[in-house]
Amino acid sequence: TGTGYKTMTNVEFFIDNDNKIYSFKVTGHVDFALDGDDALCAAISTLVSHTIGQVHEFTDDPCENIVDEDIPMVVFKLTGDEISDLSYIFMESLASSVDDLAMMHPDYIKVSYTES
């Protein structure tokens, strides 16, 4: 990008008392390559969009989704009292994939888990 510094994407997963992921927050931009050619950013965006789409398409679980393109930030939260196992599987799948990307590119992607 020619800025002389590296930015990072931060992905924070929120875990409930049953040790299940019920929410995530993605902030920042990877800047792994020039705009329009950033495979890491595209990978994270695709994984996040796919996860949200799966919950909407394959479950009736209530959820909240906040997108702020100026920050940039995406927050997604399963909000119901009774969440389906399928939604939790989708969230775990996202976490596994993002963890893999972060292990391969630790200078560009940071993953954290918060119990709440």
Across the structure, where does each feature detected by a protein language model lie?
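N-terminal intrinsically disordered, cationic/polar leader segments
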Residues: G4-A39, T46-S116
